[in-house]
Each structure stands twice: as C-alpha cells, then as structure tokens.
Amino acid sequence: MKSSQPVSRHPNNEEDFFGPRKMAPGIWQFNVWAPKPNDLTLLLKRTNEVVQFPMEKSADGFFTVTVGDDGAINHGDQYCFCIDGQNNRPDVAARCYVDDVHGWCSVVDQDQYCWNDDRWQGVAKDDLVIYEMHIGTFTQAGTYLGAIERLPELVALGVTAVEILPIAQTPGRWNWGYDGVGLFAAENTYGRPTNSSSLSMRVINKVWL
C-alpha cells in the first residue's frame, strides 16, 4: 500500500488521527482504536459491490489500513467496519453519517471547502452581543443554509457573535444536541458538511467582520 505525508488540512494536522485521514489525492488511511477485537475489516461501498480491506492491528490496540492504490477514494464514498467477521459497525470518529449513527459513514475531504477566514479578528469583550442559535429551530427549514439566509436579520438587530448549540451527530431527527453520539460529525439532518462550513464562514463574514 502506498503512503505519504498527510496533506495540510483545516483546522488540524495532528500526527495521531482518529477516523479517515487523507494521505494524498485519492489515498486515505483509516484508523480505529479497538483493543478487544481480533480482526477488523474496512468495508468500502463501490458502485455495484462492497470491497473489503483487512486492517492491521498494533500492539496498543489501533487498527489501520491505507487504501487507494486499487481505486481512488473520493469525497462522499461510504464505508463502515466489520468486527471479527460478524458485526458491521460505523466509525465513531466519522466526519459524516449517511443516514444515522448506526449505519454507513461518509468520507469527508476537507480540501473540498475553501476556507477564507484569515481576516477574522474576533470581537472585543465589551462589544459582544451574543445570539444563541439552535440550527433546527432557528428557521422553518431547520438547516445550515436556512440559517445563512437569516444572518442579515441578526446583524440588523445588533448581534455581533453567534453561539450555536451543539451540532454533533445525534440519533433520530429531532434533538437539542446535548446527547451527541457522533462527536466528530456535524448533524446531517441540518445539511451536509460543506453546508456547516459555509455557515461558519458566513457568520464570520457577516456578523463578526
């Protein structure tokens, strides 16, 4: 299997990385800490089949596999893990879940989104007017994009900062966000990962700047 140094990512670039890790275009490393199972297999959905990739276990309980040589992995590809040849389980460190936290996960290429937050300076403490926002109830749509459309109204009210209630992936359709299960993934009923990134940037550009 080919491997290389990880490319730059926003906002982190740690050496030890849970979940899918982009090593080079089309080449990804999958990491799971699971000390109890004897075997772990990566299952990757292709057009007409599910391809299996056995993972290598280290002495400290990490299972790892790097794939891409036999077919590039792309943004949005679906995957999960098979434990000891019997039980299919989602990635607890997935960046996106296809349906809910019990099913397939989706690869998220953070390089797909162009961050332009270099000008962000923050707001002086004395100038803070904070609006606490729950994405699901802030608009009729209940989505990240729906929230973006109403940001000008907050600016007109004098709001200078937005505090978003927790958006970690939860089971079910309705949730306040305080019992998130997929802690590395943004709630998919509000939209896709690029939508949540867009909301972050629009808040910075419309409210904070």
Model feature map: region roles:
Residues 1-29, 50-132, 137-142, 153:
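The feature marks proteins involved in alpha-glucan
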Residues 153-198:
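Aromatic-lined carbohydrate-binding/catalytic grooves of carbohydrate-active enzymes
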